[in-house]
Structure formats: structure tokens, C-alpha cells
């Protein structure tokens, strides 16, 4: 009984609660960073230095009345935000921080599978809202997500060939002597840009283009369900950056200080998340055709070429005599 309680309730909660707390303070950090970059102060009224602002926002959203459009599809309308958050939380289970909750042999395949399932929550919410703006936003988001998943998958394939394993622990071991960002820097650059597009962040925030689509696929959502979408989006941003740190920035390995493993990984993920915010403050939104041109005409041929290159490398060097 106790073991069941620990494995099925306490273990998941042990990573879900910190992730949700991190998401809350990431929203505050984003508002502060954008504020200072636009030469103004961010939130600074609620609590010391505005530290209680995200908690106030969360409470406000969840005590609002959940308004539902009369013409919407009732069950799907409520189910999709729940699906979005569930998927965003499940993604964290196989991440070694330093030990995964789910120790899988094919962890990277699970990431790809679960991140492509997120498409259904977006499409479902756009369709269930029964609003043309929500549907246009959802279709854009789905096209963008599916397109950039192609390059993410191919980059992951190259890295798997490079390191020789599907688990992030293998990546950890492979990067003990050199971080993968150095030999595979073109992959790292394309991966980072693709994660920006995959998480619908500026300059790829076409789905919530305020100028033409009000707020994108979640335009009809208010209160609690909207907060669930919001939490899912920011949890995905944090997850993608933690994954990027694991794949390219030597994961969490310091041979001299194994105690600092988790702090090390979190610091790298936080720095990458700050760059996400910096990009948002600096760049204007892409046009839709430029967004699609970038992936299909630029990234796809390049990633395919690099997959072939990484396939050829081990075969080429296999014939060399061992170095004494």
C-alpha cells in the first residue's frame, strides 16, 4: 500500500509541484525582463519586489467564472486544456534530474511522441470553441508544430547516432569530455530555433498574433481553463530548455562535484530560458510564409545532410588504426 502510494502519487507530485512553481516564477521573470528591456519596471506592487504577483494571478484566474460560449462543444472544450497540461507534465517524467521518475530505454522517442500529441489539444481547443479566429489560430499552430517537429526529430536522430544511445543518461556519459554544442554547433543552433517555434514563442508566435487573431486558439477561454493552457505553454518552454541543456550543454555532469548535478542542469536551463525572453524582447514576429520557408527550405535540407554526415563519420573512422 505504502509503496503504491509513493510510486503513483508522491513521485509524480515531487516533480509536478516544483515544475508548476518554476512556471509561476518564470512568468514573473518574463514580465520583469521585458520591463527592464523596455526601460520600465515590471510588476512591483504585490509582495516584495512583486514576488507574489504570479500567485495573485493564479488565484485570480481560478476564482473567475469559467465562461463557455453557448455554441461550443461542451466536453471537448473542457477536456483540451486538461490534456495540454497533462501532456506538459508527463514530458518531465523521463528527464534525469539527476534520476528520472520513469527510467526508460527509449526516453527520447517518448519526448517526440508526447510533444506531437500536444497538437491534439491545440486543434481540439480551436475546433471546440466554434469561433473562426480560434480555428485559424489552431490550424496555424498545428501546421507550425508539425513542421518544426520534422527538424527536431532529424536533429535528435543525428545526436542519437553521434552519442550511440536513446537515453539521456547516455548523452550524459557521451559529454564527459566535450559538450556536444562544440562538435555539433549547427545542430544546436537549428535545435534552439526549432524549440522556439515548437513552443510558439516570439518571433514565431504566429498562433497568438494579437494584431490579427486576438489571442489564437485559446481566444474563447477564460479563468481556470485559460490558466491551464498558460501553465502548459510555460512548462513546455522550461522542459525544452532543460532538454536542450541535457542534449548539448553536457547535461548535468561535473565529475569533481556530483552533488551539484541538479543545480548545474537547472542553471543551464535557466540561462537558456533567459535567452528565450531576450529573443522575445528583441525580434519582431515572422510572416507566416517566412516561418514555413525557414523550416522546409532551409532547416530540412541542412538537417538531412547532417544526418548523412553523422552516419558517415563513424563508418569513416572505423577503418583507422587505434591511436596510441
UniProtKB/Swiss-Prot annotation:
What are the coiled-coil residue ranges?
Answer: none
Transmembrane feature ranges: 9-29, 43-63, 75-95, 106-126, 146-166, 177-197, 228-250, 259-279, 299-319
One Gene Ontology cellular component: mitochondrial inner membrane
Q: Top enzyme class of this protein?
A: translocase
What does the record give as the reaction this protein catalyses? a ubiquinone + NADH + 5 H(+)(in) = a ubiquinol + NAD(+) + 4 H(+)(out)
Q: What is its EC number?
A: 7.1.1.2
Indicate where this protein resides in the cell: Mitochondrion inner membrane
User: What job does the chain carry out?
Assistant: Core subunit of the mitochondrial membrane respiratory chain NADH dehydrogenase (Complex I) that is believed to belong to the minimal assembly required for catalysis. Complex I functions in the transfer of electrons from NADH to the respiratory chain. The immediate electron acceptor for the enzyme is believed to be ubiquinone.
The family note in this entry says: Belongs to the complex I subunit 1 family.
Q: What is this protein's name?
A: NADH-ubiquinone oxidoreductase chain 1
| Organism per entry | Tetraodon nigroviridis
Amino acid at each position: 500500500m505504502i509503496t503504491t502510494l509513493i510510486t503513483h502519487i508522491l513521485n509524480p507530485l515531487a516533480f509536478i509541484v516544483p515544475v508548476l512553481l518554476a512556471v509561476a516564477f518564470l512568468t514573473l521573470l518574463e514580465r520583469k525582463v521585458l520591463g527592464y528591456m523596455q526601460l520600465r519596471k515590471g510588476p512591483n506592487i504585490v509582495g516584495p519586489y512583486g514576488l507574489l504577483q504570479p500567485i495573485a494571478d493564479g488565484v485570480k484566474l481560478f476564482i473567475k467564472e469559467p465562461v463557455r460560449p453557448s455554441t461550443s462543444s461542451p466536453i471537448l472544450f473542457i477536456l483540451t486544456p486538461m490534456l495540454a497540461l497533462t501532456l506538459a507534465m508527463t514530458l518531465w517524467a523521463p528527464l534525469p534530474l539527476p534520476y528520472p521518475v520513469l527510467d526508460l530505454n527509449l526516453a527520447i522517442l517518448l519526448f517526440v511522441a508526447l510533444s506531437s500529441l500536444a497538437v491534439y489539444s491545440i486543434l481540439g481547443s480551436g475546433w471546440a470553441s466554434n469561433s473562426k479566429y480560434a480555428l485559424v489560430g489552431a490550424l496555424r499552430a498545428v501546421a507550425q508544430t508539425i513542421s518544426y517537429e520534422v527538424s527536431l526529430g532529424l536533429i535528435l536522430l543525428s545526436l542519437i547516432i553521434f552519442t550511440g544511445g536513446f537515453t539521456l543518461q547516455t548523452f550524459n556519459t557521451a559529454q564527459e569530455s566535450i559538450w556536444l554544442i562544440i562538435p555539433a554547433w549547427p545542430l544546436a543552433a537549428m535545435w534552439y530555433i526549432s524549440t522556439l517555434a515548437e513552443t510558439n514563442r516570439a518571433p514565431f508566435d504566429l498562433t497568438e498574433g494579437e494584431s490579427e487573431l486576438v489571442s489564437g486558439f485559446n481566444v474563447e477561454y477564460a479563468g481556470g481553463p485559460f490558466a491551464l493552457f498558460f501553465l502548459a505553454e510555460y512548462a513546455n518552454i522550461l522542459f525544452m530548455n532543460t532538454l536542450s541543456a541535457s542534449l548539448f550543454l553536457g547535461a548535468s555532469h561535473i565529475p569533481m562535484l556530483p552533488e551539484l548535478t541538479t543545480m548545474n542542469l537547472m542553471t543551464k536551463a535557466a540561462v537558456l530560458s533567459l535567452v528565450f525572453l531576450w529573443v522575445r524582447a528583441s525580434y519582431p514576429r515572422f510572416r507566416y510564409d517566412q516561418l514555413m520557408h525557414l523550416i522546409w527550405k532551409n532547416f530540412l535540407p541542412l538537417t538531412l545532410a547532417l544526418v548523412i554526415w553523422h552516419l558517415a563519420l563513424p563508418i569513416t573512422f572505423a577503418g583507422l588504426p587505434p591511436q596510441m
